[in-house]
Structure formats: C-alpha cells, structure tokens
C-alpha cells in the first residue's frame, strides 16, 4: 500500500483536502446504494436478477464449474507451481489443525447445572475469489482450507465468469478440496450466496477479498 502525505499549511490546501474527503464520502455512499439495490433485487427475483447482472457486468451467465475442470487445471499448470500450491496447502492444514477448538462440558456447582462450550462447524461457507487481471490462488488456499479443516459441511467457491478462467485459481480450488465451484462474480454473487438463487446455495458465512462494490454488498 502506497501512502501519500500532503502538507496543508494554507487555506487553499485545506479547502482542497476538504473537497477530496467530501468526494470520497459521496463515492462511498453511491457504492453502498448500488450494492444495496443489487442485494434487494436478487432477494426479490432470485436467479433472474443474478443472470441479468452477470450479463450486464461480466457479459456471461453464471454456471457451475465441473470438478473435472478443476482437476484439468491442476494438471495443466507448471509442475513447480503445483508443487508450491500443494506444499502451501499442507502447511495451512498443519497450522489450522493446531488451532481447532474443542467442546468442553462439565457439571456446575449449581445442582443439576452444566456449563461449557460446544464447538460446531458451519453447514455451508462461501469463498469469493476475484477475477479479472489479478489471480489469487493463495487466497483460495487461505480461505478454503481452514473451513475444510474445521469440518464445514460444504465449501462453495465463486469467481467471475470470465472467458478464460485462471488455471492457477482453479488448480488451487482442486488442491484445497472445494466442494463446488460456480462462475459468478460481483455484487450479484454476494447476493446469491446471501439469499440463495436456484443452483447457487445460501451460505452461513461468506469470506474472501473483492472490490469496493463486493465489499459493500
């Protein structure tokens, strides 16, 4: 992250900074309103709205990505890249396994009472993986594997439906053990995973990086 420091000694500089802050607030408010509109629309119209937004923003319809496609990507990538992904996956599994919590229940001093905690995995988790020019296979590993180690019932990965999906990202999904992979992105992907839409399931939790619109959604 690059930070630029601006020294404002005079009236004009301070006015400029105030204007910049005002524009930033306006931009953030617009992003939030846009995201809320998409969320509400998908909640009301389901897959019909998801398809419309996907065609509008990504020029492609949402679709399921077969596991054979993920496996094929893992076979196509350079051997040294696959080795790096597999070693990273093993390290993450080892680390996350050591962090697992345990359930503990015991009798309390109060007659008939019991206290403790029950550790239970979520039923379904969604993992958002950005598309475009950037590829984040490490993000796939870091988000999918902890869920798998924790015992989450189903891990669903979504990524924008670009014409040529990134092989490194798909290979990472295969290595990490993603249960389902769906080509859908943007605010509509977040909305679909939040409320459920046709073949896109409703999830208990959604993780992963995204742009300002995805984050707002």
Residue ranges: model-predicted function:
Residues 1-123:
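N-terminal Rossmann-like NAD(P)+-binding subdomain of aldehyde/semialdehyde dehydrogenases
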Residues 48, 163-164, 188, 212:
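Short alpha-helical
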Residues 106-171:
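Conserved small-residue-rich beta-alpha loop and adjacent elements
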Residues 166-177, 193:
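N-terminal small/polar loop signature for handling phosphorylated ligands or for N-terminal nucleophile
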């Amino acid at each position: 992250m690059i930070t630029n420091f601006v020294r404002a000694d005079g009236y004009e500089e301070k006015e400029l900074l105030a204007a910049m802050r005002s524009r930033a607030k306006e931009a953030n408010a617009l992003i939030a309103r846009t995201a809320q509109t998409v969320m509400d629309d998908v909640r009301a119209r389901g897959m019909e709205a998801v398809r419309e937004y996907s065609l509008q923003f990504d020029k492609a319809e949402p679709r399921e990505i077969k596991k054979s496609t993920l496996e094929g990507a893992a076979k196509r990538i350079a051997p040294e890249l696959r080795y790096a992904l597999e070693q990273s996956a093993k390290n993450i599994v080892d680390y996350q396994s050591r962090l697992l919590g345990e359930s503990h229940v015991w009798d309390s001093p109060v007659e008939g009472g019991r206290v403790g905690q029950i550790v239970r995995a979520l039923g379904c988790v969604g993992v958002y993986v950005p598309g475009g020019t950037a590829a984040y296979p490490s993000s796939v590993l870091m988000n999918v594997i902890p869920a798998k180690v924790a015992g989450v019932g189903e891990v669903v990965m979504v990524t924008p439906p670009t014409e040529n999906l990134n092989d490194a990202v798909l290979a990472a999904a295969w290595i990490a053990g993603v249960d389902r992979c769906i080509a859908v992105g943007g605010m509509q992907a977040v909305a679909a995973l939040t409320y459920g839409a046709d073949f896109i399931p409703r999830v208990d939790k959604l993780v992963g990086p995204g742009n300002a619109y995805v984050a707002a959604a």
